[in-house]
Amino acid sequence: MSRYTKKDFPPHNVRRFLEPGPIVLVSSAHKGRTNIMTMGWHMMMEFSPSLVGCLISSGNHSFEMVKASRQCVINVPTADLAATVVKIGNTSGRDIDKFKSFGLSQKPAEQVRGPLIDECYANFECRLSDSSWVRKYNVFVFEVVKAHVASSPKYPKTIHYRGDGEFMISGENTGRWRRLFRPGML
């Protein structure tokens, strides 16, 4: 087991080590308009029902669309979409139609109004479950009401944000410690 020599580190940069899961694309629809935003701040909050907490900045165009419609689609892109994902994050849906500008295909969702992004590996249709944290923290708690996941590959290469413009691609999967794992402890 390794021991590490440590130095002081700026607390505002700890996100580099704690960023949650993969970067996702949140698609939304309201009053005849659609939008896509890039999001890295999300977390699983419950297994059943599947609840996902999502931080959306109040200055973001998607914030108002999601707040008003009370629903969205969380789309999981793979590494081959990395450049597009970054470009989407650098533009505002107030100014452009992101689906057209970035050549992405909209597919109708089954249970919400926001469109699925067909080029993404997975699409999770979500309805707002709890808005009590929106005013104070800009955190929406969504319930996944319908999930669509590609059958292959089993573990796609996803994009993860490390902070300050640094990204990571998901790596090797291993079952090496599976025998130590106790699901009852979750």
Where are these regions (language model features)?
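Basic, polyanion-binding surface patches
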Residues: 1-186
